[in-house]
Amino acid sequence: IFGMIPGLIGGLISAFK
C-alpha cells in the first residue's frame, strides 16, 4: 500500500507540472 502511494503522488506531480 505505502509502496503504491509514492507512485500515485509522483504521477499527480508529473501531471500537475
Curated annotation (Swiss-Prot):
Question: Is the keyword Repeat in the record?
Answer: no
Signal peptide stretch:
none
Which superkingdom does the taxonomy of this entry point to? Eukaryota
Q: In which tissues is it expressed?
A: Expressed by the venom gland.
- Its chief place of residence is secreted
| Protein's UniProt keywords contain Cell cycle | no
Q: Which residues carry this modification: Lysine amide?
A: K17
Give the stretches traversing the membrane.
Answer: none
Recite the UniProt keywords alphabetically.
Answer: Amidation, Secreted
Gene Ontology terms, cellular component aspect? extracellular region
Cellular localisation: Secreted
Q: Which family does it belong to?
A: Belongs to the non-disulfide-bridged peptide (NDBP) superfamily. Short antimicrobial peptide (group 4) family.
Tell me, in a sentence or two, what this protein's role is: Antimicrobial peptide with low to moderate activity against most of clinically relevant Gram-positive and Gram-negative microbial pathogens (P.aeruginosa (DSM 50071); MIC>400 ug/mL, E.coli (DSM 787); MIC=100 ug/mL, K.pneumoniae (ATCC BAA 1705); MIC>100 ug/mL, A.baumannii (DSM 30008); MIC=50 ug/mL, S.aureus (ATCC 43300); MIC=25 ug/mL, S.epidermidis (DSM 28319); MIC=25 ug/mL, E.faecalis (MF 06036); MIC=50 ug/mL, E.faecium (NCTC 12201); MIC=25 ug/mL, C.difficile (DSM 27147); MIC=25 ug/mL, C.difficile (ATCC BAA 1382); MIC=25 ug/mL).
Name of the protein: Peptide TtAP-2
* Originating species: Tityus trinitatis (Trinidad thick-tailed scorpion)
